Design a protein with these regions (language model features):
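Well-ordered beta-sheet/strand-loop patches within structured domains
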Residues: 139-142, 158-248, 252-256, 319-412
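Aromatic/His-enriched, Gly/Pro-containing loop or helix-boundary segments
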Residues: 4-9, 73-74, 79, 83-102, ...
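Long, internal scaffold/assembly segments composed of regular secondary structure
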Residues: 224-323, 327
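Post-HExxH zinc-binding segment in Zn-dependent metallohydrolases
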Residues: 115-186, 277, 281-293, 307-318
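Short pre-active-site segment immediately N-terminal to the catalytic Zn-binding motif
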Residues: 69, 89-106, 267-275
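Non-catalytic terminal regions of proteins
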Residues: 97, 101, 220, 293, ...
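Auxiliary, metal-adjacent structural segments of Zn-dependent hydrolase domains
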Residues: 3, 11-90, 212-246, 250, ...
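Fold-level signature of zinc-dependent metallopeptidase catalytic domains
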Residues: 5-9, 13, 94-97, 117, ...
Length: 513
């Protein structure tokens, strides 16, 4: 794909941008400076294929994504109106074929996103100079390609990408260290003694064999006594465990660290999709309808906005659910419809009519914007009335008639299913529970069941990539239909084998399921 041709805002768009920015600030939005670039649809698709960045490391996935976006445009199945990057300053891309009305809507939307990026707790640990960091990642990967060859590096990246979701987003807010290091060597059940840095010819003097053997003996004694378990506790950040304990070459460690860093950068976006898109939609709606929409633009705006928030029966549109839930929170706190006094009212009619004129809605939504993610947002503020109003029921298509039918209207079941799907961004919880399984240097992972079963086909693919990176047999215990199954990848590039877990299975260092 080509470079990144771009144009600056026209004088007309610049004037609109300055007015929208000033009004957004008056409302209390606190955003990073936003740099706008106007792109043609081809360049827009290129950057979208790169995940919103103009430069990424070489890999076939970007070309595949570009082809998908180009075909979508060609068949009229949709187009990208805007992209905004969590960076300081934020970078926002506008489609040059958009009307002026569309561009104003997008700019108002972007300031909502930028405010959310800057102030939401879950974004607070992200790299605010990721535009530069992505370019740095690309340079490093190209350097490895020059030395190792494109095919070798690309194959390794494929394995890393198959595991990119095996991180622990909450660990950014906690200190979780794993000081012990293990390798796939045969000595002492896979233990690798700690060595001081030294040049090759000095190594026997700096790291004498007597000291290496002392460490091996001490480790063996710990293992025998049960104190030397690796990891010391179940570890959710599988990529970090691999970086610290797998036998990887330096170039492989560098690439795996790049994939992990980028996964952590994108994680908060997955954790706050409903809140973030709803927040941006709330503000573009308020700014446009109350301040920047001219009479001649009403129809165009209504058409564009309705497209953004359209949600068919059985569908789930984060823009729609997000914006309506933000409005609902504001309405309830404006009227005091929360707390013990309101909860004690007997009837739905009394609750709906209650109004203490407290007008705390705006204050409340800014508070929620600061500290919540999608799981806590839905858990605390979704109500049965909201589910009924927007028909957030569970639907299923009848295989015989093709009709979409309601499966359940039960609020608790609907809410629980939503929370299951949002927890960990819909990805399974996998933990490393033993890095030296059966004292053979094998890796054992376990799936923590939280209501939704793991996709066995995806699990086996991830297992094959884990086997490639670990260098020794890898095992994964998962739950399927109330039974526990063990998937084992013993041979490199071989298909994992499956067996039902029985009482005779040797126990890993830690239990989980």
């Amino acid at each position: 794909m080509a470079g990144t041709p771009h144009t600056e805002l026209s004088p007309e768009l610049l004037a609109h941008m300055q007015a929208i920015k000033a009004k957004a600030s008056e409302y209390g939005l606190d955003f990073f400076e936003v740099v706008y670039e106007v792109l043609d649809f081809e360049t827009m698709n290129q950057i979208a294929a790169f995940g919103g960045f103009p430069v990424r490391y070489p890999h076939w996935r970007w070309g595949m994504e570009y082809e998908k976006l180009s075909k979508r445009d060609a068949y009229g199945l949709g187009r990208i109106y805007e992209m905004v990057i969590n960076n300081d300053p934020c970078y926002a891309y506008l489609q040059e074929s958009n009307s002026v009305t569309d561009q104003k809507l997008v700019m108002a939307h972007v300031y909502g996103h930028s405010d959310f990026f800057k102030n939401n707790l879950w974004f607070s640990k992200t790299n605010r100079k990721m535009m530069n960091e992505m370019a740095n990642h690309a340079t490093r990967v190209r350097r490895h390609i020059e030395r190792q060859g494109m095919e070798t590096v690309e194959r390794f990246i494929d394995h890393c990408l198959a595991l990119e979701h095996l991180i622990d987003p909450h660990s950014m807010f906690m200190a979780r260290e794993e000081p012990r290091r293990v390798s796939g060597s045969d000595d002492a059940g896979g233990f690798e003694p700690h060595k001081l840095p030294s040049k090759g010819y000095m190594d026997p003097f700096i790291n004498p064999e007597s000291e290496m053997q002392r460490q091996r003996d001490a480790h063996a004694a710990e293992v025998k006594s049960g104190k030397g378990r690796i990891p010391e506790r179940p570890t959710r950040d599988v990529l970090l465990f691999l970086l610290r304990h797998a036998r990887l070459d330096e170039w492989q460690q560098d690439i795996l660290s790049i994939i992990r860093d980028e996964a952590y950068y994108y994680a908060p976006q997955g954790m706050t999709k409903i809140m973030n898109e709803g927040w941006a939609t709330y503000w573009h709606s308020k700014l446009m309808t109350q301040h920047f929409l001219e009479a001649k633009e009403i129809i165009d705006y209504a058409e564009q906005h309705s497209g953004v928030v359209h949600m068919p029966p059985g569908g789930f549109n984060p823009y729609k659910i997000g914006v309506e839930l933000w409005k609902e929170i504001e309405r309830r706190w404006n009227r005091g419809q929360h707390g013990a006094a309101w909860e004690s009212l007997d009837s739905i009619g009394q609750k709906e009519a209650f109004d203490d004129k407290s007008m705390k809605g705006r204050e409340k939504i800014f508070e929620v914007r600061r500290i919540y993610n999608d799981v806590s947002f839905i858990d605390e503020f979704l109500t049965p009335e909201f589910v009924d109003r927007y028909q957030m029921y569970q639907f299923r298509k009848d295989p015989q008639t093709g009709e979409v039918r309601i499966v359940t209207r039960d609020f608790d079941r609907i809410k629980q299913t939503l929370l299951f799907q949002m927890t960990n961004m819909g990805q399974p919880f996998l933990y490393v529970v033993d890095g030296n399984y059966m004292n053979r240097g094998e890796l054992f992972l376990s799936h923590q069941f939280v209501g939704l079963e793991i996709d066995a086909s995806k699990a086996t693919q991830a297992l094959k990539s884990l086997r490639a990176l670990w260098g020794r047999p890898v095992h994964l215990m998962i739950r399927v239909n109330e039974d526990n199954w063990l998937y084992s990848a013993a041979e490199l590039n071989g298909e994992p084998k499956r067996e039902k877990v029985g009482e005779d299975l040797p126990k890993p260092a830690h239990g989980l399921m």
